[in-house]
Each structure stands twice: as C-alpha cells, then as structure tokens.
C-alpha cells in the first residue's frame, strides 16, 4: 500500500470537511487557502455561489505593511484582521470556519484568532 503525499492528505481532509461545511447568507463560510508564500481568506455564500469579501497577502493594502513575505504568522494575523474588518463592514457578524484541509495550527490558527479578535464569531 502506497503512502499519500502531504498534498494528497490535505486534499482528502478538505473533501471530508466540506461534506459538513456550507455557508449560507445568514452564516457564510470563511474559507482559508495557504500556500508556501501567501495566505488567502474569503467569505463565501455557498447558496448564492458568491464571494462576499476577501483578503490576502497579495492585496496592495497589506503588501506595503508586511515586513516579511506573506508566508509568516504575522502576515496571517494581518489577513485575519482585514477579512474580519471587511466582513463586518458588509454586515456579517458570524461565519463558519473552513480551514481548507490544513491542520488548525500555525498560520491557520493565527488567522482564525485574529479574525475572532477583530469581531467575527465562529
């Protein structure tokens, strides 16, 4: 029996999680994607199949303020605060957290904690 690669394990975990996570207009889904150099967060209404707001380390607003590259915990904290600020500005108070198959640790945990500190509930 062959072992799964780390990426395949993440994809398998993500498929398993997505069976139970859906975002509605009342409580949209906060989806997180993590690459080696950047982190992306979107607030998604799955019923309407639309992205309500997003933030990432690629945003010009954040890029100027980041000292390191986008693959650090500090960058994740900044993205979490920004996505929470944008969601609250659109009237979204509560979300369902979708960690995207990643383990709840490190940059994913930093983003989630920052979003909670900024006022999002999940």
UniProtKB/Swiss-Prot annotation:
What are the Basic residues biased-composition ranges? 1-21
Q: Please state which protein family the record places this protein in.
A: Belongs to the universal ribosomal protein uL18 family.
Pfam hit, one: Ribosomal_L18p
Recorded GO terms, molecular function? 5S rRNA binding; structural constituent of ribosome
Q: Which InterPro entries match?
A: Ribosomal_uL18_bac-type (IPR004389), Ribosomal_uL18_bac/euk (IPR005484)
Q: Which GO terms describe its biological process?
A: translation
The record lists the organism as: Parasynechococcus marenigrum (strain WH8102)
* Keywords assigned by UniProt, alphabetized: Ribonucleoprotein, Ribosomal protein, RNA-binding, rRNA-binding
Superkingdom of the organism of origin: Bacteria
Give the start-end ranges of region Disordered: 1-26
One GO cellular-component annotation of the UniProt record comes to:
cytosolic large ribosomal subunit
Q: How does it assemble?
A: Part of the 50S ribosomal subunit; part of the 5S rRNA/L5/L18/L25 subcomplex. Contacts the 5S and 23S rRNAs.
Q: What role is this protein assigned?
A: This is one of the proteins that bind and probably mediate the attachment of the 5S RNA into the large ribosomal subunit, where it forms part of the central protuberance.
What is this protein identified as?
Large ribosomal subunit protein uL18
User: Which SUPFAM superfamilies did the record assign?
Assistant: Translational machinery components
Name the gene.
rplR
């Amino acid at each position: 029996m062959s072992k799964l690669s780390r990426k395949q394990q993440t994809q398998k975990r993500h498929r398993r999680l997505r069976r139970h996570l859906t975002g509605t207009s009342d409580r949209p889904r906060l989806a997180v994607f993590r690459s080696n150099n950047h982190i992306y967060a979107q607030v998604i209404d799955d019923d309407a199949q639309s992205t309500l707001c997003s933030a990432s380390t690629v945003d010009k607003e954040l890029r100027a303020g980041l000292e390191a590259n986008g693959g650090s915990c500090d960058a994740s904290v900044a993205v979490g605060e920004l996505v929470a600020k944008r969601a609250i500005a659109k009237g979204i108070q509560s979300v369902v957290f979708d960690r995207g198959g990643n383990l709840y640790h490190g940059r994913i945990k930093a983003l989630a904690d920052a979003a909670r500190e900024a006022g999002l509930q999940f």
